Each structure stands twice: as structure tokens, then as C-alpha cells.
Amino acid sequence: MDRSNPVKPALDYFSNRLVNYQISVKCSNQFKLEVCLLNAENKVVDNQAGTQGQLKVLGANLWWPYLMHEHPASLYSWEDGDCSHQSLGPLPACDLCDQLHLRSRQGGSVCGCDPCEQLLLLVSQLRAPGVDSAAAGRPV
């Protein structure tokens, strides 16, 4: 038996997650979009530019029912819209429809009947190209 390359525990396999996202924008296609994934401490876990992509969550802290895990309240959640920590410049009236699909690395669903893993997904910057948010009177 080769011990130089030990098998990793199941926790490592199940702790890494992928978030496939697609955001439909029903307005002009002249915009810049950056999607950020934040953890419970509002720290960026991963980010991507564009209306679709895949975010990686390494070492994801999954939600567990009370008394079923030593850290049961470690939740991620997602939101979009005009959040106080977003930097939004002047925008045309847009209708954003978020279609999020949480998948494990092998393509199995991690939502539904299983303990649901919610992720904090923020549309952190959405503005027309060439529009400076600071010049528009909004903090960057």
C-alpha cells in the first residue's frame, strides 16, 4: 500500500462546491456586471464578470440542523438588488432574473431535501460603461 499519497477524507470531497449562475438582463446589453460570492463574514469567496459563469467555493461551510454539527449556523445566503454595500451608478430600468443552480463537483444537487446550502451572491457592480460611480455621487 502506497502511503505517500493518502486518500483525502470525505470532508474534503464534500466541502468544495461550485455555483453555476445565469443572470438574464432585460434591457440594453450595454452594461458591466460583476458577480461576487460572499461568506457569512461578508468576505469575497470568488467573483466573476459577466452574466453567466461558475463560482468556486473551497471549504464551504454547509448549513446543519441545530445540534447536528458543531457549527450549525454557518449559512451562506444570496441576495441581489440595491444593497447598501453595492456600488451602483446610474442605470436604465432593468429587470434582473437570477437563475442559480447549486451543484456539487460531481453534478449532484445540494439543495432540496438535503441541508440546503445557500450562498450570498451579490450583483456588486452594475453600471453603464464609461459611467464613473464616484462622479455620479455614489461611493465606490
From Swiss-Prot:
Summary of the tissues where the protein is detected: Ubiquitous.
GO biological process entries: nervous system development; skeletal system development
UniProt xrefs under InterPro entries: Beta-gal/glucu_dom_sf, Ig-like_fold
Family: Belongs to the glycosyl hydrolase 2 family.
PANTHER family: BETA-GLUCURONIDASE
Designated name of the protein: Putative inactive beta-glucuronidase-like protein SMA3
Species whose genome carries this gene: Homo sapiens
